[in-house]
Curated annotation (Swiss-Prot):
UniProt gene name: ackA
Highest taxon listed in the record's lineage: Bacteria
Cofactor binding description: Mg(2+). Can also accept Mn(2+).
Required cofactor(s): Mg(2+); Mn(2+)
Main location: cytoplasm
The protein, known as: Acetate kinase
Gene Ontology BP terms: acetate metabolic process; acetyl-CoA biosynthetic process
Active site: D134 (proton donor/acceptor)
Subunit-structure text: Homodimer.
Record EC number: 2.7.2.1
HAMAP family: Acetate_kinase
Protein family (similarity comment): Belongs to the acetokinase family.
Length: 389
């Protein structure tokens, strides 16, 4: 029997799951349980414990009994590992306690992840549970990139630094880009653009990140679906003092009512493009601001790296929106960046080159697979403890 890993991504109102074989990369099953704790859902899912049972029931209804899956571990995506949790970590009670201490750094993401881990450990007590952290890949950012220019004593006391996020995706995609090009990862200088509802950019030299757009939290950097990205901190003070908004109100606005949705009232880029075509000025502005910020980061990372071999687009928007890719890189031929219009328009779902032959900088589209990366991280940290079926 092939060994497999159950990968869980627990949010406040949803649990995404996937069962994968880390050795072969085969996806055995996947799905999502949504509207946890919400009234009026098609199937009442009162809490995360009920959601876990729905996961098991869904697997069984698809013909995948737990006993027949060859499960050897459960992998959990955790957004923030702070400074000390930066490797795939076998979860024990001490790990849970430390994650709870870190929750103020990721108040929207870590608490539901912790809850998911606790529920899964009770449901599957005989399997090792492994936490894999979004921040891990960026743990060793150069000090100049990781440090905020604020009072050093305050920063040190409260562990304030640029942690970076989407690290599992950035690492996986950079490795896949090297494999696609059949070039050693250590020899490549790369820019990776992870463009989904959450969005981030990274500059990677020889397989190690030297810059990334997200910071202490996933709010910094690029314009995102509902998050503002970079914003003058003075805006927060102004709204607090002048508009009478509380810190909680401002945080909710910057996280949930900003970005493309805040400007254009929409996070689905397919709808956004339709509205732009019909002359919607708000949709056009939202798109223009989104593209402008992306181009700003691409330019900054060209300067940071000095020379670039590969630019790679990934995640939902990056993989599927040819117009975004075109507009981010248009007019940059002086820097060696060109797109082949036909290749860029290709709807293929596999890794592919979208720059013309001979272009100084290769541009790729590489599908991300964070679930497989987490499954393989579990296999890596557990090693011989897993055995083979």
């Amino acid at each position: 029997m092939s060994r497999s890993v159950l990968v869980l991504n627990s949010g406040s109102s949803s649990v995404k799951y996937a069962v994968l074989e880390p050795d072969s990369g085969v996806l055995v099953a996947d799905g999502i349980v949504e509207r946890i704790g919400e009234e009026g859902a098609e199937r009442a899912v009162t809490d995360h414990a009920a959601a876990m049972q729905v996961v098991f029931d869904s697997l069984a209804s698809d013909g995948h009994r737990l006993d027949d899956l060859g499960l050897v571990a459960v992998g959990h995506r955790v957004v923030h590992g702070g400074q000390d949790l930066y490797r795939p970590t076998v979860v024990d009670d001490a790990t849970i306690a430390r994650l709870k201490e870190l929750s103020p750094l990721a108040p929207l993401h870590n608490p539901p992840a912790i809850l998911g881990i606790e529920v899964a450990r009770k449901a599957l007590p005989d399997l090792p549970h492994v936490a894999v952290f979004d921040t891990a890949f960026f743990h060793d950012l150069p000090p100049a990139a990781a440090t905020y220019a604020i009072d050093a004593e305050v920063a040190g006391s409260w562990h304030i630094r640029r942690y970076g996020f989407h690290g599992t995706s950035h690492q996986y995609v950079s490795e896949q880009a090297a494999a696609f090009l059949n070039v050693p990862l250590e020899s490549l200088s790369q820019i990776v653009l992870h463009l989904g509802n959450g969005a981030s950019a990274s500059a990677i030299l020889g397989g190690r990140p030297v810059e990334t757009s997200m910071g202490l939290t996933p709010m910094e950097g690029l314009v995102m679906g509902t998050r503002s990205g970079d914003v003058d901190p003075g805006v927060i003070f102004y709204l607090w003092r002048t508009a009478g908004m509380s810190v909680e109100d401002i945080e909710a606005m910057l996280n949930r009512r900003s970005g493309v949705r805040g400007l254009g009232g929409e996070i689905d880029f397919r709808v956004l493009h339709q509205r732009i075509e019909s002359g919607d000025a708000a949709a056009q502005l939202a798109y223009d601001v989104y593209i402008h910020r992306l181009r700003k980061y691409v330019g900054a990372y060209l300067a940071t790296l000095g020379s670039v071999d590969v630019i790679t687009f990934t995640a939902g928007v990056g993989e599927n929106d040819a117009a975004v890719r075109r507009d981010v890189l248009s007019g940059l031929t002086a820097f060696g960046i060109e797109l082949d219009e036909h290749l860029n328009a290709s709807p293929a779902r596999t890794a592919r080159r979208i720059s013309p032959d001979g272009a100084p900088i290769t541009v790729l589209v590489v599908p991300t697979n964070e679930e497989l990366a987490i499954a393989r991280a579990c296999a890596g940290v557990l090693g011989g403890r897993l055995g083979h079926g």
